[in-house]
Amino acid sequence: MFRSCLRHCRRATVRSRTCPRCSHHEIPQLQVVQRQISLSSSFPHIRRLQTSSTDTQERIPIRKQLKQEAKAIKSRKRERREQEEASRHKWELTVGVEIHAQLNTETKLFSRAPTSPSELPNTNVALFDLAFPGSQPEFQVATLLPALRAAIALNCDIQPVSRFDRKHYFYQDQPSGYQITQYYEPFARNGYLDLFRHDGIAPEDGDRVRIGIKQIQLEQDTAKSQEYPPSMQLLDFNRVSHPLIEIITMPEIHTPATAAAFVRKVQAILQSCSAVTTGMEAGGLRADINVSVRLRGDGSGTHQYSGIGGLGQRTEIKNLSSFKAVEDAIIAEKNRQIAVLESGGVVEGETRGWTIGSTETRKLRGKEGEVDYRYMPDPDIPPLLIGKDIISALSNTLPAGPDALIDMLVGQYGLAIEDAKPLVELEDGARLEYYQDVVDILRNLQQDLDSKTQAGLGRVAGNWVLHELGGLLSKAGLAWDAERVTAESLAALIDQLQRKRITGATAKKVLAMLFDGDRRPVAQLLEEENLILRPLSREEYIALASAAIELNPQMVEQIRSKNQLGKLGWFVGQMMRMGEKGRVEAQKADAILRELILGLSQ
């Protein structure tokens, strides 16, 4: 029907051109337009058609399209950064942290049941853990020792008298209907923790920030629940009454990065003093975060926390299990609260949750207060009395903390902070101990060398322990093992390198051989594999120098006539390239060149 319309001029016209039947002119564009009589009215079963020799939409090349999309994404990110920067200057973030850490103990807090995490479910359970009628709490004194070590390491004042309270709530993970804690009279108060730039604090917090610790309290852990959708949930009561400490900060943190740095450093301190055995990565440490915002410089807020007034309404984000989750959850909740306030809304006090990889927090329930939990003294547990003698004994035997170790590595071993920090943190100090063994052995091996060489041993050993040996472990996907390459073998290898008996490439090759199981002593391995450098003779130096001189006689003339001695370095470089790698010593090569070019004998 469409073609028949084209054949009859009376049924159709051609825009900007005469009909093909009436003219021989070429028509670059053909578009049939409807006349006064609608085709759709004459032929209701046929849809209106339109043709064109060009696409109605211009096609964009895929490469250009990808560039445009990337540019748009970059623009959106820039706008988001600008908005965050603007909100940072307008709004003040306030964060308080509550850290729950499982103590390093053999028994539970109020029963003699063991705390071993590797047993089958519901096997390490006492009658009191399950709240059997008639069972009574029996405080295990040994559980107090790691708690005291933690409190001393965090600069807290140990209270001579503390008491236990009941925190009432009904949930399946707490069979007694209450948790035993120390809400009113905790065993430790008024601590603090200093954070530095190398700890990862935000740039706007400067070089150092001190975070106050309101209190540290002893309390019970709860059961571990496992969900099996759609409706099954299993409970493992092995964890019930496992001793915990809860570390509660003052609301003095104002950046997400600094909050994450605080949690990270607390974990390192607790591990260094053996207060805990596992950290966040194994579920032994969890963090709850309290977040509020207010207009910067505006102290008219109606809320007060820990004696600090003028704050905004806070929300609590529960059970964060990684340092990144702490930072990301704070950012998300801060942005949510700012959006609520800027839209004229009101921030509700509530408990919220966070899912890894999410961009928003989610509401779990309304925030309970002191009245909701109905705190009351526990009538079955007597007061906890702590004498000054035990505090003094623990303080004197407490190992050095991370800050003291970093200062020691920087001051005594000459390490950069960037190398000292991972040595302290990796493998709970095992690699630091290995490093110190390597340096001690090296110093004994190199007593005959000059003091300048010995002063640099700490930096050299740090590079080999952290980067060379650490790189082999990472590449192989293996955990730290000090016996894989013994401290004696690594020290002997570094000694050979320092004495220029082997090249750096040879040292790395030998380290790989030791790493793969070669147990020969380093000296024997180098000899049998013919890896020791043989010093070049005078004749060999002269031959290399003569060959280098022939490469550029014009430069030789410039050195002689214009005394451009700096150009001797070019010839030294040529000699090192032409000679066997690592055998040409720059100082000897320079002396031979001066002798041949300038006639100087040194």
Curated annotation (Swiss-Prot):
Cellular component, GO annotation: glutamyl-tRNA(Gln) amidotransferase complex; mitochondrion
GO BP annotations listed: glutaminyl-tRNAGln biosynthesis via transamidation; mitochondrial translation
Transmembrane segments: none
Sorted UniProt keywords: ATP-binding, Ligase, Mitochondrion, Nucleotide-binding, Protein biosynthesis, Transit peptide
UniProt cross-references to InterPro entries, sorted A to Z: Asn/Gln-tRNA_amidoTrfase_suB/E (IPR017959), Asn/Gln-tRNA_Trfase_suB/E_cat (IPR006075), Asn/Gln_amidotransferase (IPR018027), Asn/Gln_tRNA_amidoTrase-B-like (IPR003789), GatB (IPR004413), GatB_Yqey_C_2 (IPR023168), Gln-tRNA_amidoTrfase_suB_CS (IPR017958), Gln_synth/guanido_kin_cat_dom (IPR014746)
Pfam families documented for this protein: GatB_N, GatB_Yqey
KW Mitochondrion (keyword) present: yes
Localization, UniProt: Mitochondrion
Reactions listed under catalytic activity: L-glutamyl-tRNA(Gln) + L-glutamine + ATP + H2O = L-glutaminyl-tRNA(Gln) + L-glutamate + ADP + phosphate + H(+)
Documented EC number(s): 6.3.5.-
Assembly and binders: Subunit of the heterotrimeric GatCAB amidotransferase (AdT) complex, composed of A, B and C subunits.
PANTHER family, per the entry: GLUTAMYL-TRNA GLN AMIDOTRANSFERASE SUBUNIT B MITOCHONDRIAL AND PROKARYOTIC PET112-RELATED, GLUTAMYL-TRNA(GLN) AMIDOTRANSFERASE SUBUNIT B, MITOCHONDRIAL
NCBIfam families assigned: gatB, PRK05477.1-2
Name of this chain's protein: Glutamyl-tRNA(Gln) amidotransferase subunit B, mitochondrial
Source organism of the structure: Emericella nidulans (strain FGSC A4 / ATCC 38163 / CBS 112.46 / NRRL 194 / M139)
